């Protein structure tokens, strides 16, 4: 893959998450009854960062959990057409709560659909919202994010790579040309 550009550096990611945190607070008129659920891998640390920002702004903790979606078959080379839920972990009830799913990149929406199904199978929330760091287009399902860090229209030959300190040792979002 050939690097085209760096879309967000560590400071830009931090500013973006602060903005998303403010938008969540404003839209929900506070943070009462809000639960953040990160879509593993990179959605979970993003959800934790948003929760930390919200606590700093509002002075209230927000519960954070995760849903683990399997995107690959056992050989780890072929992406599944229909992602499946591996596990969901949230230590609080989501019944009648406002659940905000958090993911790094919104692409085909299949992962988000699987996460929505997992949340609905767990319990009946008041509603589900979606926050993403990057929306790159190419949706296959009628799902849109309520909170978007950055809209990046891409071609199908481009790859968006989100790197986070918690997993990759650095914070950045880069776009690559995939060489087929």
UniProtKB/Swiss-Prot annotation:
Pfam families: Pribosyltran. The keyword Cell cycle does not apply. Belongs to the purine/pyrimidine phosphoribosyltransferase family. PyrR subfamily. Keywords: Glycosyltransferase, RNA-binding, Transcription, Transcription regulation, Transcription termination, Transferase. A motif (PRPP-binding) lies at residues 99-111. It catalyses: UMP + diphosphate = 5-phospho-alpha-D-ribose 1-diphosphate + uracil. Homodimer and homohexamer; in equilibrium. GO terms for biological process: DNA-templated transcription termination. NCBIfam families: PRK05205.1-4, PRK05205.1-5. GO terms for molecular function: RNA binding; uracil phosphoribosyltransferase activity. This is Bifunctional protein PyrR. The gene is pyrR. Its EC number is 2.4.2.9. Regulates transcriptional attenuation of the pyrimidine nucleotide (pyr) operon by binding in a uridine-dependent manner to specific sites on pyr mRNA. This disrupts an antiterminator hairpin in the RNA and favors formation of a downstream transcription terminator, leading to a reduced expression of downstream genes. Also displays a weak uracil phosphoribosyltransferase activity which is not physiologically significant.
